[in-house]
Amino acid sequence: MTYQLSKLRKAVLFFSALLLAAPAAAALGRDSLELTPPMGFMTWNKYKDDISEQLIRRIADRMVSTGYAEAGYKYIFIDDGWQGGRDKRNNIIPDPVKFPSGMKALADYVHSKGLLLGIYSDAARLTCAGYTGSYGFEKQDAKTFAEWGIDYLKYDYCHAPSDSAVAHQRYRKMGDALQDSGRKIALGVCEWGQLNPERWARQAGGSLWRVSYDVRDMWKDIVGQGGMGILDIIDITEPLYKYAGPGHWLDMDMLIVGLDGKGGPSSDLGGVGCTYTEYQTQMSMWCMFASPLAMSHDLLDENEATRRILLNKEMIAINQDAFGEAARRVDFPGVCRVYLRRLSGNRLALAVMNPSDKPQSIQLPLSVIGKAQKYAFRDVWEHKTALWQKTWQGDLQPHETKVFTVTAR
């Protein structure tokens, strides 16, 4: 195999410099709200707007009893459909049938489990599903969310002008309102990456921002209807790595691991389901890019294959690593893709992905990683360690991703 040596040398210099560099100082202001990517469960893909306080309580209980909370999944994100309009004073209220005890009581219950509660609204009069939005009531709603004990706001952009300056203004207004609410509430900018939020979302007070339209339960879009598969979102995220860091994250949308093509919004636009090899690749690359990890499968009826992927402590540790840098793709010839991410403790995370529909063999010169003669490769999925010199060799199944933590020896 012939390698593009000049490009590989550039990669060597870049990642050698990363290993020698000191971590950046802690981010200031709202950047300090989410110093590692938030993790939790989001209601939309499984339940859409068929949600209730009883369901949220069951999910909270389940997250604690099955080890998800201990693994780092701390948030329950209530998505669209909780709203019941506004009262006579224009205070936003929850649907009294779905949430008869009110949001404060629910937040208190979630907090009693050691978890955090997120909620949803929109930067327009109506939300994506046609419920009450927050446009024009930003300060009032932010104060209400604070009084309820909300910890996170997912703020959508349906029914709003397709203009970057307007989007920045609307998100900034809510970001300022949250900051003045008297409670620390993180802001998730859900604009879908169409108006370049990487350039303004952080300044608007966002702790994270979506990079794409909604993820669908598929490997990639093959029907041409605008659905986003796993590979489509990876492609979109690759060039955005430099915008990620502690307190400001690239949100690649929900994890579809374990949905199994069972319907709901994730099955729209060609979402027919994925193999567990593909689900494992989603977890791998979401962690490599330091994306938030929001589960969306049926927590109340899950299989062990799903749990094995979502509860992999070594993979989660990469996602939550204190350096907070997103992976960068190395310019490497051939079908397989190579990604590197700096980790604390003078380590690197290495991901090798086969995006093709055929098995692939790869020989990776270790000069891509650095100048050492020997490296210890810790296979994050197989939980095995091996020493490699000069070249790493491996075989990858279609759509498979292998992930290693790498240390010079």
Where are these regions (language model features)?
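Bacterial N-terminal signal peptides
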Residues: A11-P23
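Structural recognition of the beta-strand scaffold that forms the well-ordered cores
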Residues: P37-T43, G72-D79, L116-S121, D151-D156, ...
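Aromatic-lined carbohydrate-binding/catalytic grooves of carbohydrate-active enzymes
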Residues: I59, M63-S164, R170
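Aromatic-lined carbohydrate-recognition surfaces of secreted/lumenal glycan-active proteins
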Residues: L115-Y131, Q179-N196
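Glycan-recognition surfaces
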Residues: F137, A186-D298
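Carbohydrate-binding surface patches
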Residues: Q280, W286-F289, A294-S296, F332-K371
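Catalytic cores of secreted or luminal carbohydrate-active enzymes
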Residues: T281-V330
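C-terminal beta-strand-rich structural cap/linker in extracellular carbohydrate-active enzymes
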Residues: W388-R409
